[in-house]
Amino acid sequence: MDGDSSTTDASQLGIAGDYIGGSHYVIQPHDDTEDSMNDHEDTNGSKESFREQDIYLPIANVARIMKNAIPQTGKIAKDAKECVQECVSEFISFITSEASERCHQEKRKTINGEDILFAMSTLGFDSYVEPLKLYLQKFREAMKGEKGIGGTVTTGDGLSEELTEEAFTNQLPAGLITTDGQQQNVMVYTTSYQQISGVQQIQFS
């Protein structure tokens, strides 16, 4: 799905402002079946310019997660934090892009959990699929009909959340149950699911 090919603005058509202001109209082709990949476009049809840091996860959050994997006395250089920050953002874009392709093929606008699992399997991250599938099932069972923090949580194929920033600051307990039944002490950060009873963290290999 090429975002640039889905819009046509006046400058591309070579039409002056006076012409548009008259009784004539410029028709912009838009496929309603496409997802909202171009939501960041402004009213003129041109893409907004973003600072490089705007597309990354907050580096403080990335650093906090990294620090959990090293001894308390350990330190992490700034360039290492920035490197992981960029890698994580690229990974998210990589997975989401593949999931978005599936949505486009099936003429849907909303990426759901199954799309993410399908994308991870397609891109070779098979070892993550089964644990995530179990977690997604537990999550949906626990959140069914409940109110999420800061807004409504709906379940099913159109699973969506409106969560406040506070929801991303909590973490699950350290005891994890792996797919082979072994318990390990590994910290995994996620959204605020402390309130969900019966949800267990899963160790990824």
Swiss-Prot record:
InterPro entries the UniProt entry points to: CBFA_NFYB_domain (IPR003958), Histone-fold (IPR009072), Transc_fact_NFYB/HAP3 (IPR027113), Transcrpt_fac_NFYB/HAP3_CS (IPR003956)
SUPFAM superfamilies named in the record: Histone-fold (SSF47113)
Broad class of where this protein is predominantly found: nucleus
Any Gene Ontology CC annotation: CCAAT-binding factor complex
Region (B domain): 51-140
Disulphides: none
Disordered: region residues: 24-50
Biological process per Gene Ontology, one example term: regulation of transcription by RNA polymerase II
Annotated region (C domain), positions in chain: 141-201
Keyword NADP attributed: no
Region: Subunit association domain (SAD), residue numbers: 84-95
Pfam families: CBFD_NFYB_HMF (PF00808)
Keywords of the record: Activator, DNA-binding, Nucleus, Transcription, Transcription regulation
A GO MF label: sequence-specific DNA binding
Region annotation (A domain) ranges: 1-50
PROSITE patterns: NFYB_HAP3 (PS00685)
Domain of life of the native organism: Eukaryota
Phosphoprotein keyword on record: no
DNA-binding region listed in the record: 57-63
Function: Component of the sequence-specific heterotrimeric transcription factor (NF-Y) which specifically recognizes a 5'-CCAAT-3' box motif found in the promoters of its target genes. NF-Y can function as both an activator and a repressor, depending on its interacting cofactors.
Similarity comment: family membership: Belongs to the NFYB/HAP3 subunit family.
Assembly and oligomerization: Heterotrimeric transcription factor composed of three components, NF-YA, NF-YB and NF-YC. NF-YB and NF-YC must interact and dimerize for NF-YA association and DNA binding.
Protein name: Nuclear transcription factor Y subunit beta
Organism name: Gallus gallus (Chicken)
Gene designation per UniProt: NFYB
